[in-house]
Amino acid sequence: MNFIRIMAVLALVTVGSQASAQPKSLRDQIIGTWNFVVAEVVAPDGKKSFPFGETPKGIIIFTADGRFAQIHVASDVPKIASNNRLTGTPEEYATIMRRSISVFGSYSVNEEKKTVTFKIVSSTYPNWEGEAQERSIDKLTADEFVNTNHNVAGGRGSASNFYKRAN
């Protein structure tokens, strides 16, 4: 009888350790808060550019229930001279629009294709509202996340976003 109990306990321990040793899904790994490091656009000719500069600010948050929120801002976006967000000049507004983006909605992860698809509810660029945008997951570790849009508007090449997990 004791032998059977011991074997049963060993079987449970073995099954439990095998289950915990299985790698987390991409979806489980992506959940959390990530600090934006840089966005890199690679043109068809191989030339690289950084639309938010080389030291941007930003964040992307993925929730367990499939929601996301993202903001990217260039570190050199000038303040509005009037100190009133409603009375900026056309030039100030144009700079802000070119040097920042905010978007939120829901997301899904395709484990086989290693992609994340953003279903955009709203954005500071209203043309994206209602779109589904797919990104490849190029790197996803405990501390780093890189995704790439391989179809940047206007045929400008690909755009990769680099993130580090927030503490």
Which sequence ranges carry the predicted segments?
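Bacterial N-terminal signal peptides
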Residues: 6-16
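Lipid interaction determinants
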Residues: 17-167
